[in-house]
Amino acid sequence: MTLLHWTLPLPAGYRRDDVIAFHGRDGEAVAEQVTPTGLRKGILLAGVPVVLDVAFTPDAAICQADIDGDGDLEAPLHGALLNILGLRIDPQPFAQLAAGDPLLAPLVRVNPGLRIVQSASPFEALTWAIIGQQINLPFAISLRRTFILQAGRQHGSGLWCYPEARDVARLEIEDLTSRKFSRAKAETLLRLARLVDEGTLSLELPASGDVAAMSQALLAVKGIGPWTVNYALLRGYGYADCSLHGDVAIRAALQKLLGEEAKPDMARTEQWLRQYAPHRTMAAAHLWASLQPPASDG
């Protein structure tokens, strides 16, 4: 076993509870375990099981990677930590943009320092988007757990590790459809995994950070549509300008914000969100948050 260590400074107003809540959604904790002051997450990286262990202090994240093997994994693991801690997108530029906005300024005041917490990798974000689309959250979490247990591997500590494309590509469709996955979801997951594993589809962004070519390549995969691509850009790549106009919750939040009787359609939502470019990801984050009940003072 190899151990790597980092101490990552946290910005003022960092919302650790949001990060812990995001990674603690699966009550059975097969691949993520959380406490009030930290988290552990299992991932496969270059075929090697790794557990990322994070302990929060008031101004830093004390991080350790427990690696079941060898390999030069320090740089990609540091990147995965930035992802799962929500440190990719700085919320301040959007907060400054929204400060004079009569609609969004109140949302930002209610949730100062709100961040986008990401999946550990683009592949995890894409597969989670496919798994969770058009079903309720508890069922989606259950299917995600099944997916991890079918395709992932256990770390020496016992924690399961989220699979990579190669692990998923080995599955047969019946491995998923016999466990409550629809055939369409199962086919899309295996299709994506096999394209990535064989090298036909790369999930690496170009050095320029241009997401247009990546978006088009993903849209060419049968079963992947604009919503899945935008969600992957947000949760997988930390792209700051995702337009989530196809998201039902975003449209519901906009309906509430505008005080209208019906949800705006996708075209109108897309047009409305354009005014917040190049910070539409954070606009979406605050719209999502506006649907949550206010925290109790007691």
Identify the residue ranges that each predicted region occupies.
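HhH-family (HhH-GPD) DNA N-glycosylase catalytic core used in base-excision repair
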Residues: 1-298
